[in-house]
């Protein structure tokens, strides 16, 4: 089996690429970073530090790399069995034209074997969005062939892969946590379902997408925002602060009540899932900076993301949300010289005040009780 993976960054190398290579799949990375491409093609291998209670160093080998903006990547798309991505949500649109060209070439060469494409991004139904971009780049005469032969498979991914400075200045070395979860929608595949250790197949993907978004992502963000306000540097430092931990755990329990109501998750199992995530935040081997986790607050405060979406669920079912509101208020306080969205957020609050600013960013009604609660919490944490 041959696979092409877009994105040779830390998540690409340390998570999805590693799982594919470990499964014996012939893997080629596509990226724009020439330093990383040259290193991969010189060595065809790299090291992954898996850190937890038992640290281990795994070697991923037998890999190649091509530029994601050249002809080589188009040629590969005509022949591979699987395409995966870990490029970040905003980059999906940029790689779509190359994928479209490759699919046209595949059709022209008479390659009718099924191809499946899986976007492994921190977003809801990312592959469906990628499919829209690819279809927009195709001529009408090619669309029916693509619909028939190409599966666009949505997935949920979960592994903390912070940026880490290599002790040896190796551009390929990457550090990851022990935990990983890659859940894919088995109803969207074309052809035979793949058997890849570490890939879990489900016919109820949205339950797992929201479980991850409402728990890991919600908890991670609130830990970062409260941690930044309290002067902590890392996620571990923040979650070991009992006052922060109480709000984070409370927020995950509030969002969890929505999941239990919506999808029928077992309450005891979900409580154990929350405890596992708190343990991941405490991992002493991951230097996860609150500034990194908190960045892009406008996106994280938008209607479909990790803070507002679970809040909307509590409103839908008439459930408590006091800790989620505290997290939203902390996000509104996020300031960073390195993050344009943090600066835009600050300017918006200065210009319009917290009430109108939150309503504009989140889509919530400016005159609603919940916006008033968030503004009160925001003012109380000044």
Swiss-Prot record:
Q: Which domain of life is it from?
A: Bacteria
Catalytic activities: D-mannitol 1-phosphate + NAD(+) = beta-D-fructose 6-phosphate + NADH + H(+)
Give the Gene Ontology MF terms in alphabetical order. Answer: mannitol-1-phosphate 5-dehydrogenase activity
Enzyme Commission number: 1.1.1.17
A Pfam family annotated for this chain is: Mannitol_dh_C
Residues holding NAD(+) = 3-14
Alphabetized SUPFAM superfamilies for the sequence: 6-phosphogluconate dehydrogenase C-terminal domain-like, NAD(P)-binding Rossmann-fold domains
Q: Which GO terms describe its biological process?
A: mannitol catabolic process
> Which keywords accompany this UniProt record?
NAD, Oxidoreductase
Q: Which GO cellular component terms are attached?
A: cytosol
Q: What class of enzyme is it?
A: oxidoreductase
Write down the InterPro entries for this protein, in alphabetical order: 6-PGluconate_DH-like_C_sf, 6PGD_dom2, Mannitol_1_phos_5_DH, Mannitol_DH, Mannitol_DH_C, Mannitol_DH_CS, Mannitol_DH_N, NAD(P)-bd_dom_sf
The answer to whether keyword Ion transport applies is: no
The family note in this entry says: Belongs to the mannitol dehydrogenase family.
What is the recorded name of this protein?
Mannitol-1-phosphate 5-dehydrogenase
Species this protein is from: Salmonella agona (strain SL483)
Tell me the classification of the organism that encodes this protein.
Bacteria, Pseudomonadati, Pseudomonadota, Gammaproteobacteria, Enterobacterales
């Amino acid at each position: 089996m041959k696979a092409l993976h877009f994105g040779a960054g830390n998540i690409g190398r340390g998570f999805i690429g590693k799982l594919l290579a470990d499964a014996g799949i012939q893997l080629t990375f596509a990226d724009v970073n020439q330093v990383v491409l040259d290193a991969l093609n010189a060595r065809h291998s790299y090291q992954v530090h898996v850190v937890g209670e038992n640290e281990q160093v795994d070697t991923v080998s037998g890999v190649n790399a091509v530029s994601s903006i050249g002809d080589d990547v188009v040629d590969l798309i005509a022949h591979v069995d699987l395409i995966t991505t870990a490029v970040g949500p905003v980059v999906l649109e940029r790689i779509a034209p190359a994928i479209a060209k490759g699919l046209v070439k595949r059709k022209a060469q008479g390659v009718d074997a099924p191809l499946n494409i899986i976007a492994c991004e921190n977003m809801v139904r990312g592959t469906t969005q990628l499919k829209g971009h690819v279809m927009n780049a195709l001529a009408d005469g090619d669309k029916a062939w693509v619909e028939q032969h190409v599966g666009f498979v949505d997935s949920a991914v979960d592994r903390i892969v912070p940026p880490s400075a290599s002790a040896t200045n190796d551009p390929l070395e990457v550090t990851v946590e022990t935990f990983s979860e890659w859940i894919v929608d088995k109803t969207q595949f074309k052809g035979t379902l793949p058997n890849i250790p570490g890939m879990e197949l489900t016919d109820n993907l949205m339950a797992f997408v929201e479980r991850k978004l409402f728990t890991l992502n919600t908890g991670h963000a609130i830990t970062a925002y409260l941690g930044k306000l309290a002067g902590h540097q890392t996620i571990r430092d923040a979650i070991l602060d009992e006052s922060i931990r109480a709000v984070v755990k409370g927020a995950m329990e509030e969002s969890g009540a929505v999941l239990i109501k919506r999808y029928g998750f077992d309450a005891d199992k979900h409580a154990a899932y929350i405890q596992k995530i708190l343990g991941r935040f405490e991992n002493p081997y991951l230097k996860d900076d609150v500034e990194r986790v908190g960045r892009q607050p406008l996106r994280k405060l938008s209607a479909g993301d990790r803070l507002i979406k679970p809040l909307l669920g509590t409103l839908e079912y008439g459930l408590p949300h006091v800790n989620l509101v505290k997290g939203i208020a902390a996000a509104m306080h996020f300031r960073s010289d390195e993050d344009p969205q943090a600066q835009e957020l600050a300017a918006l609050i200065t210009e319009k005040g917290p009430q109108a600013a939150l309503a504009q960013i989140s889509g919530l009604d400016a005159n609603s009780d919940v916006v008033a609660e968030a503004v009160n919490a925001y003012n109380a944490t000044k």
